[in-house]
Amino acid sequence: MSDTATYTPRLRAKYTETIRAAMKEKFGYANDMMIPRLDKIVINMGVGEASQDSKKIKGALEDLEAITGQKPVKTVAKKSIAGFKLREEQVIGAKVTLRQDRMYEFLDRLITIALPRVRDFRGLNGKSFDGRGNYAMGMKEHIVFPEIDYDKVEKIRGMDIVVCTTAGNDEEAKALLAEFDFPFTN
């Protein structure tokens, strides 16, 4: 076997070694399976101009693949909307669902590298939870990720990032993400 078989992402190790114990102590869970954990991270990049020119989606797919290390899935319009010149089944964006090690690696890069590079960054809004333990945030520029070469980018795009947890409510989810060093402002 190679060394990669024993590799554990930094945040996964932090979760198993310190975060689980801290969460169990703070909320008093009866057993270890009740402790919230990260389930998945979904990254969505909408490409509205792809409805006019289908070649525009290619750059978004390549950038999303470079950022996540996983091939994105094209998202299509569910129904036609004449006002937006949109047809049903037309490609309008791309998304990636990250789980396991790739999820922890992406989260590590997001917290330690990408968020500090965001212009005028003052922290994340602590009220962007959905009531069921999931946190959603938006980024206006995808070039803050180190995998993106600024000179080769045809257009700066935004992206939506949703962090899904197994927490039952927002309080537990916020405590979990705060343990992962999410820079919440409130």
Swiss-Prot record:
Source species, domain of life: Bacteria
Keyword rRNA-binding annotated: yes
Lineage of the species this protein comes from: Bacteria, Pseudomonadati, Pseudomonadota, Alphaproteobacteria, Maricaulales
Family: Belongs to the universal ribosomal protein uL5 family.
Biological process annotations from GO: translation
UniProt KW keywords: Ribonucleoprotein, Ribosomal protein, RNA-binding, rRNA-binding, tRNA-binding
The protein's name in its UniProt record: Large ribosomal subunit protein uL5
Alphabetized InterPro entries for the sequence: Ribosomal_uL5 (IPR002132), Ribosomal_uL5_bac-type (IPR020930), Ribosomal_uL5_C (IPR031309), Ribosomal_uL5_CS (IPR020929), Ribosomal_uL5_dom_sf (IPR022803), Ribosomal_uL5_N (IPR031310)
Subunit structure: Part of the 50S ribosomal subunit; part of the 5S rRNA/L5/L18/L25 subcomplex. Contacts the 5S rRNA and the P site tRNA. Forms a bridge to the 30S subunit in the 70S ribosome.
RNA-binding in keyword set: yes
GO cellular component: ribonucleoprotein complex; ribosome
Gene3D superfamilies (UniProt xref): 3.30.1440.10
GO function terms (MF aspect): rRNA binding; structural constituent of ribosome; tRNA binding
Pfam families given in the database record: Ribosomal_L5, Ribosomal_L5_C
Its job: This is one of the proteins that bind and probably mediate the attachment of the 5S RNA into the large ribosomal subunit, where it forms part of the central protuberance. In the 70S ribosome it contacts protein S13 of the 30S subunit (bridge B1b), connecting the 2 subunits; this bridge is implicated in subunit movement. Contacts the P site tRNA; the 5S rRNA and some of its associated proteins might help stabilize positioning of ribosome-bound tRNAs.
